[in-house]
Amino acid sequence: MQTLNTLDLQTTSLKIVDGKLWILDQQTLPQRQEWLSADTVELLIEHIQALRVRGAPLIGLSASLLLALLAERGLPQAQLEQALIALRESRPTAVNLMNNLARMQQALLHANWVAAMTHEALRLVEEDRELCERIAQHGVQLVKPDSNLLTHCNTGGLATAGIGTAIGVLLRAHQQGKIKQVWVDETRPLLQGGRLTAWELGELGIPYQLICDSMAASLMAQGRVDAVWVGADRIAANGDVANKIGTYSLAVLANYHRIPFYVAAPHTTHDPDCPNGAAIPIEQRDASEVKGVSGGFGHCQWAPANAPVYNPAFDVTPAALISGWVLDSGVITPGQVAAGFFQPKN
C-alpha cells in the first residue's frame, strides 16, 4: 500500500517530507521563502486562519493530506472525525475545503479507512492538477492575441496543486504568445496581488505591471484592459461568485466599460446547495489588516490605533456581471447559467 509517510510529495506551496506536512509561508513572500511545519490540526488551522496557507483549492488539499497522515500514524477514527470538524470550521467561505473534507469523511467510513484516506488525499492532489490544466485549456481559447489582461488576488500555483486557475489561463496564453501584459491589482488589504501574483508572474516570465486597486478604472477608461480574469472561492446555484474583496468592484467597472469579465474555477468550487450570493458566509477579518501592513517586509501602521474598521475578506459578484465561468468542463455562458446550469441536479 502506498503511504504518505514514505512518499515525498511537493507542489509550489505544500510538501510532505519524511511523513510530515510543510507549507510555504505566504505571509513572508516575496522577501523570504520559508517552509513551516503544519503537522498538527492546531498548527494547520492557525496557518489557514493567518493566511500562511491560502487559496480555496490549497486549503482543502492541505487539510486532506494532514488527515491522511494522521490516519497513517494511528489516530483513532473518533479523533479523526473531531479533527475533520475543526478543519471544516477554519474558514467559512471557501467551499473547496468543505467538498474535500466530505470526501475524506466518506473515506473514514471505509472498512480499511487508513488506506482509503491516503488514496483519497492523493487522488485529490492529482485531480486538482488535472482540473487546473483543463481550466487553462478552455480559458486560453478566450484570450485574444496581444491582450492586456487584468487579474486580482492570487490564483496560481501558490493557491492550488497545479498551474492555478486564472493564472493557469494566463500562463498558457503567454506560452502561446497571446499576452502583451498583465495588470496585477495589489489586492488590499493583504496585498496578495502585490506580494504573491507579482512574484509568481515574475517567476513564470509573464510580463506584468503592478497597480493599486484604485487604478483599474482609469486603465479601463483608457482602453488598456482587454479582459479581467479572476478566481472564485464559491459559486452559488444561480452563478453568483464569492471571491477576494474587490472582485465585485472590478466586475462593475468591466461591465460599464464593456470589458469581458471571466471567472476561472474548478467544479469543486461550485456549491449547488447555496442558492445565491446572499447565502454565502463572508468571513470578517481582524481590523489590524486594514490599519497597517505586515509580512516578510516588516510592519507599518498608518491608521489611528482606535480607528473603527470594516474588513470582509470576500465580496459577491452577481452572475449578471460575469461574461463566462471557465470551469474544467468548459466555458459556461450566461445563457446556460440562466437556464439552471449551476442549480442542483435531481
Curated annotation (Swiss-Prot):
<keyword id="KW-0028">Amino-acid biosynthesis</keyword>
<dbReference type="InterPro" id="IPR011559">
    <property type="entry name" value="Initiation_fac_2B_a/b/d"/>
</dbReference>
<comment type="similarity">
    <text>Belongs to the eIF-2B alpha/beta/delta subunits family. MtnA subfamily.</text>
</comment>
<feature type="binding site">
    <location>
        <begin position="243"/>
        <end position="244"/>
    </location>
    <ligand>
        <name>substrate</name>
    </ligand>
</feature>
<dbReference type="InterPro" id="IPR005251">
    <property type="entry name" value="IF-M1Pi"/>
</dbReference>
<dbReference type="InterPro" id="IPR037171">
    <property type="entry name" value="NagB/RpiA_transferase-like"/>
</dbReference>
<dbReference type="InterPro" id="IPR027363">
    <property type="entry name" value="M1Pi_N"/>
</dbReference>
<feature type="active site" description="Proton donor">
    <location>
        <position position="233"/>
    </location>
</feature>
<dbReference type="InterPro" id="IPR000649">
    <property type="entry name" value="IF-2B-related"/>
</dbReference>
<dbReference type="GO" id="GO:0019509">
    <property type="term" value="P:L-methionine salvage from methylthioadenosine"/>
</dbReference>
<feature type="site" description="Transition state stabilizer">
    <location>
        <position position="153"/>
    </location>
</feature>
<feature type="binding site">
    <location>
        <position position="91"/>
    </location>
    <ligand>
        <name>substrate</name>
    </ligand>
</feature>
<dbReference type="Pfam" id="PF01008">
    <property type="entry name" value="IF-2B"/>
</dbReference>
<dbReference type="InterPro" id="IPR042529">
    <property type="entry name" value="IF_2B-like_C"/>
</dbReference>
<keyword id="KW-0486">Methionine biosynthesis</keyword>
<comment type="pathway">
    <text>Amino-acid biosynthesis; L-methionine biosynthesis via salvage pathway; L-methionine from S-methyl-5-thio-alpha-D-ribose 1-phosphate: step 1/6.</text>
</comment>
<feature type="binding site">
    <location>
        <position position="192"/>
    </location>
    <ligand>
        <name>substrate</name>
    </ligand>
</feature>
<comment type="function">
    <text>Catalyzes the interconversion of methylthioribose-1-phosphate (MTR-1-P) into methylthioribulose-1-phosphate (MTRu-1-P).</text>
</comment>
<keyword id="KW-0413">Isomerase</keyword>
<dbReference type="GO" id="GO:0046523">
    <property type="term" value="F:S-methyl-5-thioribose-1-phosphate isomerase activity"/>
</dbReference>
<feature type="binding site">
    <location>
        <begin position="54"/>
        <end position="56"/>
    </location>
    <ligand>
        <name>substrate</name>
    </ligand>
</feature>
<protein>
    <recommendedName>
        <fullName>Methylthioribose-1-phosphate isomerase</fullName>
        <ecNumber>5.3.1.23</ecNumber>
    </recommendedName>
</protein>
